[in-house]
Design a protein with these regions (language model features):
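A metal-dependent, Asp-based hydrolase signature
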Residues: 1-44
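C-terminal cap/substrate-recognition subdomain and adjoining C-terminal extension
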Residues: 30-34, 38-46, 51-196
Length: 196
């Protein structure tokens, strides 16, 4: 795999983490979620990613998204550094345990729809009025299909999720399309305007 190749080539954990920290994240996306957090204190944020813990816990602080804490929960694949410097990834759903029964096309390691449902169940006392889901990959189709009529999906144009919605349909929620992060920021501000 790629991580094993990087390790064989002598790339250190520090070099990999530095590359992760250098990855760009548009300031408008950061402003959009921070504005939502500061003006709507009852908002919960779930980071639902098919990435891994090491990547996420390296990137978030470098973009100012770790403190004050933004995410109520982060659901992703476990990962850790081996003593020899190899980044070891594990599947969120172990290949040795019970598997998900998703028929929408989620990857074997995680059904994002099941994970979203489990999050809502864990926080059932919150009685969410609306879920706003921001996604772009084809693996975001399953949770978007589970959203209801009061929910909104912010879908990045010309990506896997937009293609699946167009080709397969079956979505009950409102879909708002965006291309650049500034559009996502505008949509967030329109949907949840900052309090005066």
């Amino acid at each position: 795999y790629l991580l094993e190749e990087l390790h064989k080539e002598g790339h250190t954990p520090e070099a990999i983490q530095e590359a992760l920290r250098a990855m760009p994240m548009h300031p408008a996306m950061i402003r959009g979620v921070r504005s939502l957090q500061s003006h709507h204190h009852g908002t919960d944020f779930l980071l639902l990613s098919n990435s891994n813990e090491v990547y996420i816990h390296t990137i978030l602080p470098s973009k100012g998204l770790a403190e004050p804490p933004l995410f109520t929960e982060i659901v992703t694949n476990p990962a850790h550094w081996e003593p020899n410097g190899l980044l070891r990834l594990r599947r969120r759903i172990s290949p040795d345990g019970p598997q998900h029964a998703c028929k929408v096309g989620c990857s074997a390691n995680m059904c994002k729809g099941d994970e979203l449902d489990a999050f809502k169940q864990r926080h059932a006392d919150r009685k969410y009025e609306r879920i706003v889901y921001v996604g772009d990959g084809g693996n975001d189709f399953c949770p978007v299909k589970r959203l209801g009529p009061n929910d909104v999906a912010f879908v990045r144009r010309n990506r896997g999720l937009a293609r699946r919605i167009l080709q397969e349909g079956g979505v009950q929620c409102t879909v708002r399309y965006w291309t650049g992060a500034w559009e996502a920021e505008q949509l967030l501000n329109l949907l949840c305007p900052p309090s005066p």
